[in-house]
């Protein structure tokens, strides 16, 4: 199986954009925290988060199929991680998130992007961020307009958590 270090190198090989790298690292950090919280394999969950958008920059029309069919199998990425990455984009792959790692990857993807956008407009970034301010931004459809509110809601449902609890957990993760 691929190591965290190998996964980092693979991500850096395919992703040049600092913002997309940051997004992937945030999703990896979120997945790592949830894996530890749920007593799951933190390395697999972290790597799934880190590599979930591996092909987005170079092959946007083929995302995530280019990665899951061509790139990740050759990099010795496990079938579990490949399945999670496949299921994080069900509208593109037809594969719905079913296993725990798949559901959590879906749940962390869009909300991490949204929380990063919220942090960018706050002087203290994540420090002192509250659910109420995030919720207010969520209701403002013009703020981070490219982030799917439906996917954020569905993600919280998939992991059986109120959105406020999911967001609160992630804020805590990103302030560590």
Task: Specify the residue positions occupied by each region the protein language model found.
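Generic structural signal for well-ordered, non-membrane alpha-helical segments
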Residues: 4, 20-24, 60, 64, ...
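Divalent-cation-assisted or electrostatically stabilized phosphate/pyrophosphate-binding catalytic cores
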Residues: 128-168
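Acidic/His-rich, divalent-metal-binding segments that scaffold phosphate/diphosphate chemistry
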Residues: 1-59
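Alpha-helix initiation and N-capping motif
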Residues: 4-8, 44, 78, 131, ...
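Divalent metal-dependent catalytic cores for phosphoryl transfer on phosphate-bearing substrates
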Residues: 38-141
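A generic alpha-helix surface/boundary motif
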Residues: 5, 9, 25-29, 64-66, ...
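Long, highly charged low-complexity segments enriched in Glu/Asp and Lys/Arg with interspersed Ser/Thr
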Residues: 167-176
């Amino acid at each position: 199986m691929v190591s965290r270090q190998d996964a980092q190198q693979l991500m850096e090989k395919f992703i040049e954009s600092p913002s997309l790298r940051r997004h992937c690292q945030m999703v990896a950090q979120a997945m790592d925290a949830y894996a530890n919280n749920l007593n799951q394999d933190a390395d697999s969950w972290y790597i799934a988060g880190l590599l979930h958008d591996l092909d987005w920059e170079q092959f946007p029309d083929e995302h995530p199929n280019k990665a899951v069919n061509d790139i990740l199998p050759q990099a010795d990425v496990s079938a579990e991680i490949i399945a999670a990455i496949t299921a994080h984009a069900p509208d593109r792959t037809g594969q719905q998130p079913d296993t725990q790692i798949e559901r959590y990857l879906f749940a962390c993807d869009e909300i991490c992007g949204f929380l990063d956008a919220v942090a960018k407009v706050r002087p203290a970034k994540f420090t002192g961020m509250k659910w109420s301010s995030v919720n207010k931004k969520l209701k403002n459809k013009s703020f981070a307009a490219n982030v799917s509110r439906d996917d954020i809601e569905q993600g919280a449902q998939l992991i059986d958590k109120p959105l406020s609890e999911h967001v609160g957990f992630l804020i805590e993760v990103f302030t560590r």
